[in-house]
Amino acid sequence: MYRGRFAPTPSGPLHLGSLVAAVGSYLDAKAHRGEWLVRIEDVDKPRAVPGAADTILTQLEAHGLEWDGSVLYQSQRDSVYQHQLNQLENAQRLYQCDCSRRAIRARSDHYDGYCRNRQPRSTPYALRFINNNPVDTFNDRAHGLLEDHSASVSEDFVLKRRDGLYAYQLAVVVDDIEQGITDIVRGSDLITPSFWQLTLWQYFTGKQPRMMHLPLIMNDDGLKLSKQNHAPSIESSQARNNLFTALDYLGIKPESELRHSPVSEILQQALQSWCKKWHIAGR
């Protein structure tokens, strides 16, 4: 059974770019008669803004994006991530690294495995995954075959940070596997970390989820629309207009008379268009 998810970081309310990812992942799940889960990716606790998670959920509801099951919060799952690290340590797939970013940059444009065969001389330290079998190619439903044979893809990447926080790469894969995610639909800015994540998927399960990376929305300066670049939040009171704009970026144009219809009707027509666009049968 198809199971997808939308996994925002609660560093602020949803903006148009994150709405595009939410709508795309929602439509794809419903087109496949699957489930659409919501996960709050607050593993990076200092980035989480108080109240932002609740605001995001309210915004999703206002736009007719109803999720299946209960919402998962990464900030409540430290013991799960630590257990997985313990398993990796027992399998001798981790090592300690006390290299600073400055030290790494001074040696190379990627992490060179400097600490793999030595004990760190000081604390704190990060934990790196011994990346013996990197995944450097995968098929993307929107982009076709994607390849990255650069040294950064095959480097030993961090699973627990020097500040003691669990790395996003670990948390997202552990959660996806535990939740039974079969399909990941998200923005194209996450293509690069996909290679590390698929490496972990392959190590943990021997298989990979289907991937689909959606187009990004750029601002007037040519930068990705994001909270970091001060993208304005969407207004729930403008849900119909927001959906029309998001769907336009996804290559879907609902009939203009639907601008005054309930959001459920807009999404229903968008669902039919999504099936046609991506050649999904059965709707």
From Swiss-Prot:
Binding-site positions, L-glutamate: 5-9, 41, 168, 186
Motif 'HIGH' region mapped to chain: 8-18
GO molecular function: ATP binding; glutamate-tRNA ligase activity; zinc ion binding
Ligand binding (ATP): 227
Top-level class of the enzyme under EC nomenclature: ligase
Record-listed Zn(2+) binding positions: 97, 99, 111, 115
EC number: 6.1.1.-
Highest rank taxon of the organism: Bacteria
Biological processes per GO annotation: glutamyl-tRNA aminoacylation; tRNA modification
Listed cofactors: Zn(2+)
Role according to the record: Catalyzes the tRNA-independent activation of glutamate in presence of ATP and the subsequent transfer of glutamate onto a tRNA(Asp). Glutamate is transferred on the 2-amino-5-(4,5-dihydroxy-2-cyclopenten-1-yl) moiety of the queuosine in the wobble position of the QUC anticodon.
Family under the similarity heading: Belongs to the class-I aminoacyl-tRNA synthetase family. GluQ subfamily.
Protein name (database record): Glutamyl-Q tRNA(Asp) synthetase
Record lineage: Bacteria, Pseudomonadati, Pseudomonadota, Gammaproteobacteria, Alteromonadales
Gene coding for it: gluQ
